[in-house]
From Swiss-Prot:
A cellular component annotation (GO) from this entry: cytosol
Annotated binding of NADP(+), by residue: G167, R168, S169, I233
Catalytic activity as recorded in UniProt: (6R)-5,10-methylene-5,6,7,8-tetrahydrofolate + NADP(+) = (6R)-5,10-methenyltetrahydrofolate + NADPH; (6R)-5,10-methenyltetrahydrofolate + H2O = (6R)-10-formyltetrahydrofolate + H(+)
Protein name: Bifunctional protein FolD
Organism this protein belongs to: Zymomonas mobilis subsp. mobilis (strain ATCC 31821 / ZM4 / CP4)
Family: Belongs to the tetrahydrofolate dehydrogenase/cyclohydrolase family.
GO process annotations (BP): L-histidine biosynthetic process; methionine biosynthetic process; purine nucleotide biosynthetic process; tetrahydrofolate interconversion
Amino acid sequence: MTEAIIIDGKEFSSNLRNKIAEDVKAFKKERNVVPGLAVVLVGEDPASRIYVRKKEEMTTAVGMNSLSYRLDANASQQELLDLIETLNHDPAVHGILVQLPLPKHIDTPTILEAIDPDKDVDGFHVVNAGRLAIGTPSLVPCTPAGCMMLLEHSLGSLKGKNALVIGRSTIVGRPMAQLLLAADCTVTVAHRHTKNLEELCRQADIVVAAVGIPHFVKASWLKPGAVVIDVGINRVPAEDEAAKAAGKTRIVGDVDFVEAAKVASAITPVPGGVGPMTIACLLNNTVQAARNLTSAS
């Protein structure tokens, strides 16, 4: 049996960042403007700090301005709203990202809706969600955008494909379904409570797993030759007994990768698949936002 092609998100995202760097260079020459991405971090969550640092490094690497804002964990919601309002009106800022999760005393939807939709490079604002739903050009959530790039790279045209999205979050599942519809797929959205999930999987040419449960999707569910995009990032105990006893962990996806790779024609690994694409698409959105904002001014 032929093993699946491993879809290398690291390599693809590296090539995409190189292209973005060229776009930034051309944009600077054309409009004499440097795209600026403002990243706001509230508190000292260790994982968030790592993500923010990666975003800052990659923003600078492609030639854009990286603007960092740090608020204390007990900063008030109004303080954060005031900062966002300032960034909304700052002409040097073309993209605004508020790192999630936020402290419990801050209402996340209120914060996300306060960001100027034209600077909402995460694509989470209700205006951008609405634009996506009706097929109007918009800033698209980064993870689904990255998934689409990987699918189109693997399959070429997606027209007429049966696509199953397992997961219904506003960050991945729902926008993913909208993007697949726009690409002329026949789309089914399922979740952990869907009764005939295995049957739906066996009919799908494309399976996007974004349910947040380790190894939820089994190889036996898959249609032979399906393309599998695993969005899951789940931390589980290390396989090695000594490492497990020491409390060490490893990252796995929502798909049983080893067995699924024996059935699928192509599959993303975890880590190294979808994850690297998310930051690259964030940078891509920032350049797009800068173009939109400067052309409108």
